[in-house]
Amino acid sequence: MKNIFKTFIILAASFVMAGCLKSIDDTGFDPQTPNISFSEENLSIDQNGGELKVQLNSNLPWRVTSDAAWLTISDENGLEGKELVLTVAKNRTRKERIATLTAWIIADKPVKMTVSQDPTPAGESFTYYVKVDGDGLAEGFTWETATTLASAMEKAADGDKICVAAGTYTPITLIPGGETEEERTFEIHSNFTIEGGYPADAVTGAVVDPANNETILDGVGSAYHVVVVSAAKDNTPAVLKNVTITGGRTHTANQQTYRQAGENLVDIGLAGGIYIGKANFVMENCKVIANAAALAAGCYISPNAEVTFRQCVFQNNSADSNGGGIWNAGGTLYMYDSVVAQNTCGQQAAGYYSIDSGGTITVSRIYNTLFLENDCTQKNEKRSGGALYIRAGSDAVFVNCTITGNKAGYGAAISGHGTGQEAAKLSNTTFFNCTITGNHANNGGGGLFAYNVGAQITAYNCIVSGNTSSGTAAEAGVMDGVDANRVLVKNSVLGSSLVDATGGPVGGWGFSTSMLGELGYYDNSLTKCFPLVVSADNPAVDQGLSNADLQAVAGGFSPAVDMDLLLSGQNAIQRTKKSIGSYNAK
């Protein structure tokens, strides 16, 4: 009986299913044809920005994107048609800008609309005046009606200038997308100039005097980035002058959490002091001191940025991992008469770090700069790059520089580190007229050191002497198994010898560090250097390359080496005869 009942149930279920299938087959399925469109093809808005509304018509689920960071969309996807709210940032540039919205149901059949925004009118350049006790509601057009720094920076557009009185300023404005107090920063969002160094009680007619009127931008140990440069790259640069940047402290771990500032994705673990996005940026007479970060404690330079530092100091910055002082990740840096000193890191590159980013070559042209007492051994005695750590995809040239007192496991003055593959992009470093002395490596390369075959280091007309190593290659050398020609020292002083164009010793000459004077300011120097002790037996005084020979070997670089600076020396004395090192003998 049970078997008969089970059979009956199975047969009944089969009839029901068959009926359902027949019903489905009879009715069929008629998918909708995708239909999507914007209610407008073009919209425009004035320079001040704000909100726009547009209807997106769609009969099926859709997605929409904007190709511009300055235009955001309330909804990036939906199931059916919807009114979208477009938020447009203020246009502080002198150019009209256009964004394109792209919407689709099927990816290969999108629809588009454009949003154009008026520029800030040409000729409307303003100067704003800022004091510590300024009024945030004041217009800020005179010292007597001074405003706050946050207010002035919010108002400023391309071509404007902000004059800042002496005192200490802390950031109060969140980076775009920021959520916590630590994300407050001074954002240089446009190509304007900030100039500190005016008297605290400045009145109309006050004259800038930075030596007596220190202007401090202070992150008070909590701001992830004291300064963020997010201005769009333009022929006219953003400029920062006569300020001290201090007290930055990024997130303690590199969490790869990003904020969109202009066209830049800013990592909260990078750059406690100053984060430089894809911008044309000039910094003059500034100090970046006592900042901390997971990575790039003092300064981070983004890919495709073009940056100039003049008479700047990067000192006492400390990274938990790589990059104590400056980290250049695919930018072009011109640095003049500056100091990179006493920076530390837990891993590589205490002083200056150069590495390509996504295939973008990192370019460095560094003149008359002192690299002093940078140390990457405090947490791990084997780490590389005390003063300089030059990685794959780098084109670095150092002219008239002094590198002294730096410490590392490998490469106290410089560690060149390529990919380890001969055919890959090299780490290329060239020194002209540099003095490299008094650096110490725990493992190898107190002076010049190539870590692998991907590195090439060449020194012309340099003093490389008085460097030490507890391992190998006190003055210059390579890692075991690496071709010795990866480090070349030509027409220079190397250790106790004068060497010729082949790197071989020149008979009849010797050298010791007693032939160098005390580190200090000499003649017209803006940074400290070692003078030469003038004596008949000091080869650095009248040997080395002639002016013509120097210009010849330095003539093939792009960007070009500045020939005037090449011949002027770190002591800013025109070279009238042969001499070796950063100090031009008289």
What are these regions, as identified by a protein language model?
Residues Y224-V228, L498-V499, G503-K586:
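C-terminal accessory segments
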Residues V16-N42, V111-S125:
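Bacterial Sec-dependent N-terminal signal peptides
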Residues K131-P176, T185, V226:
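Acidic Gly/Asp/Thr-rich repetitive segments characteristic of extracellular carbohydrate-active
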Residues L84, A99, V111, F126, ...:
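The right-handed parallel beta-helix/beta-solenoid scaffold, focusing on the short coil/turn
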